[in-house]
């Protein structure tokens, strides 16, 4: 019998996290810090949307961002629109870290692509992209 969507997605999440944890190595950065760094757009992001994007509560995000700030990878600044709102922005060192993370992610992508039968590569790529769009739509529908 084939696996249900839930079983496949659960296994996929675990396996994908395992690959990323093993293959992405950034000195002195935890996996959660790497995920946060890779999520912060170049223009910055407010704390609440960042917490939602990486799937943690605001208090956990605050501690995580404090550690990133202590490492010199981000700055926390008051939003110009509302001084009560905190924005997280990458420093130059944080931008460099983000570039390094992207390079390491690209290497993982290349390894996976090479592991897929040449004939099936486009189909696999399109299926992953389709799944990604479904997840984005689900996330947007929940706001």
Predicted regions mapped to residue ranges:
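N-terminal leader segment of winged-helix/HTH proteins
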Residues: 1-27
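Terminal interaction helix/tail motif
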Residues: 103-143
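Residues in the recognition helix of alpha-helical DNA-binding motifs
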Residues: 12, 64, 127
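Canonical helix-turn-helix DNA-binding module
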Residues: 43-95
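A cross-family signal for key residues in well-ordered alpha-helices
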Residues: 35-38, 99, 125-126
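A structural signal for well-ordered alpha-helices, especially hydrophobic packing surfaces
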Residues: 13, 44, 98, 132-139
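Short helix-coil-helix linker/hinge
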Residues: 27-32, 91, 116-121
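N-terminal helix-turn-helix DNA-binding core of bacterial DNA-binding proteins
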Residues: 18-60
């Amino acid at each position: 019998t084939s696996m249900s969507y839930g079983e496949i997605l659960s296994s996929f999440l675990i396996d994908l996290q395992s690959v990323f944890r093993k293959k992405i190595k950034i000195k002195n950065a935890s996996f959660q810090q790497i995920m946060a760094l890779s999520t912060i757009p170049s223009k910055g992001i407010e704390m609440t949307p960042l917490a939602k994007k990486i799937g943690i509560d605001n208090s956990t995000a605050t501690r995580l961002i404090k550690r990133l700030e202590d490492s010199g990878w981000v700055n926390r600044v008051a939003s110009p629109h509302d001084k009560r709102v905190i924005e997280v922005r990458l420093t130059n060192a944080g931008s460099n870290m983000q570039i390094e993370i992207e390079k390491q992610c690209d290497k993982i992508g290349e390894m996976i692509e090479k592991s897929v039968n040449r004939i099936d590569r486009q189909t696999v790529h399109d299926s992953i992209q389709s799944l990604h769009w479904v997840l984005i739509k689900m996330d947007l529908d929940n706001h």
